Amino acid sequence: MDGKDKATGKCPVMHGAMTAAGVSNTSWWPNALNLDILHQHDTKGNPLNGFDYRAAVKGLDVGLRADLHALMTDSQPWWPADWGHYGGLMIRMAWHAAGSYRAADGRGGGNTGKPARFAPLNSWPDNVSLDKARRLLWPIKKKYGNAVSWADLILFAGTVAYESMGLKTFGFGFGREDIWAPEKDVYWGAEKDWLAPSDGRYGDLAKPETMENPLAAVQMGLIYVNPEGVNGQPDPARTALHIRETFARMGMNDEETVALTAGGHTVGKAHGNGDAKALGPDPEAADVTVRALAGRTRIWAARRRRPSPRGSRAPGPRIRRAGTWAISRCSSGHDWELTKSPAGAWQWKPVTIAEEAKPLDATDLTTRHDPLMTDADMAMKVDPSTMRSVRSSWPIRPPSTTLSRAPGSSCCIATWGRRRATSAPMCPPRIWSAGPGAAGPTGWDVAKVKAQIAASGLSVADLVATAWDSARTFRQSDYRGGANGARIRLAPQKDWAGNEPERLAGACGARTDRGGAGASVADVIVLAGNLGVEQAAAGVSRWRCPSPPVAAMRAAMTDGPSLTCWSRCMTASATG
């Protein structure tokens, strides 16, 4: 039966109209103001109906940690673990979630589980096979349900993976709440193709600092830099410059970058072992029946026997060997030469290396392979500044065994904001938590301060604009900015053109002089904004409820004076 055919008795249900690609309002009017993003955090889209996750997670069953430890060595036939341990995969999943964070606008990061679960990041080329990592976590998520969010589970899995391999971690803080749909307000770049050349992102590709803000990754579909080199052309010295800029845009310095890379690359391996054309569709394009197993290659059984190993020297990853292996690759006397992976990607291998020094095959422990370094790894060997960071930290703490947990923790925490927004006793008390400090003074005379502000001679515009300029810097993405701390009176905010520096200096100066009675400057700025709104609304009648009967309203609206009063009431309602 077909509802489109009226001549024969067929299905009366219309097909296609609701699924066909139509023309949206945005397509018709591309310059119209798009208000969709105002609804992306609407509670109506949350299926948990007011569930307070941050309160509930405080009672999380401690068995979660044991379950994750068990998962690490429970290799599944549909996606076997490298060396019998899923640690490398879980660490990559956690880091690619946290590492999408951008300091410039606070977007990305692992705060809501969005990079791992939703487009476009769930299908980026750099995130290939991470859907399998999430699928491995599914039995645990199903067991604990709402007691642990996807956002927390993904990052905690990375933490437990390191613990399972012998690393003592800094701790972990729970409390990240999931979102339920892709975000519409994140700019990932203007390119239309995955891995499009980097040139369009830079004013001058030779100067990494000219990358378009707020971007951090060098190409569409990558988390950081191209492992083969700038635009896929190996040149370690050139790549080093882009590494420094990209990781700086994530808030990391050279030492943290070295530690993070060494710690991650030591316990994992490269997987470019076959023809990319043999891969299936990415998760977002895959059939709904295989969404958790998308991208599997048709030659998987043969492909997994031909790995390009990277990192660990032992059949099972061992963090205790990480420093002697990963960092020695950069600082030892090995000479390296360019080669290509089975997939045709540029990489580096030792010119000579003893057989016993080669890492074991991930699946056949009787076979050894040459280790590899990406162009990004080689960049740290040839860059003098990076090597100074390696050598300065090595005598005190092997970067990949101790320090690697610091940048990983800092980037995971970067999207938390205030430490009090997190839960659980494992939360590390570090400065990364961006706490607002001690609470401001209380008990001061509000009426007295308001009177002083009113007598300052500042206009309504000064009062309201300064308060709004202070508050509007708040970023829900990483909880930075906002009125706390009155940072608007300090550099760089005091010099921003959008804050009208001359007007701002006068307003803050007047307010600070009259902020007696023990009030903080931050509180006085906000209070002054409230006073400005009150002054603007002074003398305006408030809306009365219930409204007059419709008939009486219609009669009144024919009268000119009534229309004027009506307008004033509507204005007061909007202002209030």
From Swiss-Prot:
GO terms for molecular function: catalase activity; heme binding; metal ion binding. Binds 1 heme b (iron(II)-protoporphyrin IX) group per tetramer. Heme b binds at residue 265. Keywords: Heme, Hydrogen peroxide, Iron, Metal-binding, Oxidoreductase, Peroxidase. SUPFAM superfamilies: Heme-dependent peroxidases (SSF48113). The active site is at residue 96. It catalyses: H2O2 + AH2 = A + 2 H2O; 2 H2O2 = O2 + 2 H2O. GO terms for cellular component: cytosol. There is a cross-link at residues 95-224 (Tryptophyl-tyrosyl-methioninium (Trp-Tyr) (with M-250)). There is a cross-link at residues 224-250 (Tryptophyl-tyrosyl-methioninium (Tyr-Met) (with W-95)). The record marks 92 as: Transition state stabilizer. Formation of the three residue Trp-Tyr-Met cross-link is important for the catalase, but not the peroxidase activity of the enzyme. The keyword Metal-binding applies. Homotetramer. PANTHER family: CATALASE-PEROXIDASE (PTHR30555:SF6), HYDROPEROXIDASE I, BIFUNCTIONAL CATALASE-PEROXIDASE (PTHR30555). Belongs to the peroxidase family. Peroxidase/catalase subfamily. This is Catalase-peroxidase. The gene is katG.
